Amino acid sequence: MTKTIIHFFLVILTLSGLSLQAQKRILYNIQVTYPDGLKKNSTVYLDINNDKADFYEARFITPGQKPSGLVQAIERKSGTSENTILVQDFKLNSFRIKTTDILDWKLTNDYKTVEKYKLQKATALFGGRNWNVWFCNEIPLAEGPYKFNGLPGLVFEAEDTDGVFKYSLMKIENLSKSSVQPTLNVKNAVNITWEKYNKLLSDFYENPYQKERESAQKGNEIVYEDKEMKVQDFTKMTKDFQAMIRKNLPPYVEADKNFLLNKTN
């Protein structure tokens, strides 16, 4: 976070003021470090509209942006632990998962200053990761990126101790009638549990060409990229698909929810 950016959002805070009944759009940079060491940065948004909080990817307000992972957005009543998560599967079907996520925050006596704002450090074990979070008591918004809320001030930074994820506050804007609104009410999104959702992912991972394989077994002609496919061809294609998923699937913020945890191939 540079001094220029910090100064920009501090000016906005000073001019507009903040309250518990706020209408704010908070922009965070998220840096994700992949297992091969590759680092990817993107912008995510947290809209606080009175008693409602929406956390989402840039693609929901920026045309042409592609999804960066399976978890697309999170909606909740601000200050509560009841989250509704918008997710996709490998076939781009959309689902909604309702979760209760109570974070057991441990407040520390560690402080640092960002410009004139004093930040306090808090820690929590969440989603199979240990998290260090810096929040500002002077900004009485009990919110933050992803599911990191419930602290006595706005979250400025959140990072897991393995360095896989790092959220950094970029700036704060006022929400108004002229603000571009995210389209989170995805049509045909099906309500589902984490368990059933992970089973869908796992089943497709194990047999992504099930219909094509079964059709070929019945003697039907299957053509893929101008090549007639035999039953045995789908075995190699499946292994290639699985290798691609293991290499390219973005890390999960909640590592203990990753459907690949118990996969050995």
Q: What is each of the regions a protein language model found here?
A:
Residues M1-I26:
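Bacterial Sec-dependent N-terminal signal peptides
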Residues L10, L15, N109, E143-Y146:
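Exposed boundary/loop context
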Residues L10, S16, F95-I97, E159-D162:
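Homeobox/homeodomain signature
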Residues T14, S19, T113, K147-G150:
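Generic detector of intrinsically disordered, low-complexity, polar/charged segments
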Residues L20-V114, K118, G127, W131-N132, ...:
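Extracellular or lumenal secretory-pathway regions
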Residues R25, Q31, L141-S168:
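Structured soluble/peripheral alpha/beta segments that form catalytic or ligand/cofactor-binding pockets
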Residues R96-T99, T123-N149:
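Covalent nucleotidyltransferase core used to form phosphodiester bonds in nucleic acids
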Residues K118-A122, L154:
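Short beta-strand micro-motifs in enzyme catalytic cores
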